[in-house]
From Swiss-Prot:
Record's subunit section: Monomer (G-actin). Oligomer (F-actin). Polymerization of globular actin (G-actin) leads to a structural filament (F-actin) in the form of a two-stranded helix. Unlike for mammalian monomeric actin, monomeric actin is able to induce oligomerization with ATP or ADP. Mg(2+), which is used to coordinate ATP, is required for polymerization.
Enzyme Commission number(s) of this protein: 3.6.4.-
Activity regulation comment: ATP hydrolysis occurs in the polymeric state. Unlike for mammalian actin, ATP hydrolysis also occurs in the monomeric form and the release of inorganic phosphate (Pi) is more efficient.
Pfam families registered for this protein in UniProt: Actin
Chain positions recorded as ATP binding sites: S14, G15, M16, K18, D157, G158, V159, K213, G303
Name of the top EC class for this enzyme: hydrolase
Subcellular location: Cytoplasm; Cytoplasm, Cytoskeleton
Note: ACT1 and ACT2 differ in their polymerization, filament stability and helical structure. Unlike mammalian actin, Apicomplexa actins do not form long and stable filaments.
UniProt KW keywords: ATP-binding, Cytoplasm, Cytoskeleton, Hydrolase, Methylation, Nucleotide-binding
Protein name: Actin-2
Modified residues (Tele-methylhistidine): H73
Primary localization: cytoplasm
């Protein structure tokens, strides 16, 4: 491929879009996967008002907008808005012409097949890209950690999944996915605040709660102990958060009660197993000979794994589940928020990958279903 045709890597998360150029060591732009539309009619004649705002601009004007996320649980639910997000990514953030660059997109495992077909169709027909590829998020995270064997526990805003990979081969029968992730924790946090008498209801206020969650939440090593401590010595746990209007809000036991749902989903009324059990079940679906290596290479990835103590707590929970002689090792790379993107950057700049792209010709010959044949 010629020098100017450097690939674009776009990791479309349910919560954030991470995008940049292949070969870079970090994404060039990261913005929320949000499309906002004005709630009120505009009466200021001459005021430049758009019918919709994307990403940070929507975030900044959120007070007057209704915000929508076009991706829910890793699946695109609104393709028109998704197109706007991609348009914003290429033209406003990266400032490139997509028709000149191959594009690598990412997707959660066990997604409906139509999702990636539609992605392929939009890339070739709307953005006219010369070539594209869709890769599974967890596999890219493993690339980024420099391993070829391990079980990736990826938890983002919309979906969490555990994917065992052995010597570079994904074991599809052992993939587990739970549709519980960061966004569910944000909603849970809103509920916890309501119990305290702080109501956050609008889509804009939800973003404030997300910020509180990201800045102040942590995972308790022992949930019951921590609850006891928060009742007896609440001052040790409480933190003050300043709201955009200058009011102060005290955040106490919510700090660990909110993310505890990752290990105990019944707290938010979900029947799915916790992250540790999901990972354990994935390992148990694998061949008995490779389990030891998987236990020893549990790799965290995604923004919802950024809580303090998550590695230690997961190690503790996995130790309780695994055979007593088993050595458990949880790897929590500091850049794990972006490890999917970093893995995509590594993959798309490998010389051996260049024959993997789906080209425009192949698309024109076979249509969108080509994506199932050429991408895992």
């Amino acid at each position: 491929m010629s020098e100017e045709a450097v690939a674009l890597v776009v990791d479309n998360g349910s919560g954030m879009v991470k995008s940049g150029l292949a070969g870079d060591d970090a994404p060039k732009c990261v913005f929320p996967s949000i499309v906002g539309r004005p709630k009120m009619p505009n009466i200021m004649i001459g005021m430049e008002q758009k019918e919709c705002y994307v990403g940070d601009e929507a975030q900044n004007k959120r007070g007057i907008l209704t915000l929508k996320y076009p991706i829910e649980h890793g699946i695109v639910t609104n393709w028109d808005d998704m197109e706007k997000i991609w348009h914003h990514t290429f033209y406003n953030e990266l400032r490139v012409s997509p028709e000149e660059h191959p594009v690598l997109l990412t997707e959660a495992p066990l997604n409906p097949k139509t999702n990636r077909e539609k992605m392929t169709q939009i890339m070739f027909e709307t953005f006219d890209v010369p070539a594209m590829y869709v890769s599974i998020q967890a596999i890219l995270s493993l690339y980024a950690s420099g391993r070829t064997t391990g079980i990736v526990l990826d938890s983002g805003d919309g979906v969490s999944h555990t994917v065992p990979i052995y010597e570079g081969y994904v074991l599809p029968h052992a993939i587990n996915r739970i549709d519980m992730a960061g966004r569910d924790l944000t909603y849970h946090m809103m509920k916890l605040f309501t119990e305290r008498g702080h109501t956050f209801t609008t889509t804009a206020e939800r973003e404030i709660v997300r910020d509180i969650k990201e800045k102040l939440c942590y995972i308790a090593m022992d949930y019951d102990e921590e609850l006891k401590r928060s009742e007896e010595h609440s001052d040790e746990i409480e933190e003050i958060y300043e709201l955009p209007d200058g009011n102060l809000i005290t955040v106490g036991s919510e700090r660990f009660r909110c993310p505890e749902a990752l290990f105990n989903p019944t707290l938010i009324g979900r029947e799915c197993p916790g992250l540790h059990i999901t990972a354990y079940q994935s390992i148990m679906k694998c061949d008995i000979d490779i389990r030891k290596e998987l236990y020893n290479n549990i790799v965290l990835s995604g923004g919802t794994t950024m809580y303090n103590n998550i590695g230690e707590r997961l190690t503790k929970e996995m130790t309780n589940l695994a055979p007593s002689s088993m050595k458990i090792k949880v790897i929590a790379p500091p850049e794990r928020k972006y490890s999917v993107w970093i893995g995509g950057s590594i993959l798309s700049s490998l010389s051996t990958f260049q024959q993997m792209w789906i080209t425009k010709e192949e698309y024109e010959d076979s249509g969108p279903s080509i994506v199932h044949r050429k991408c895992f």
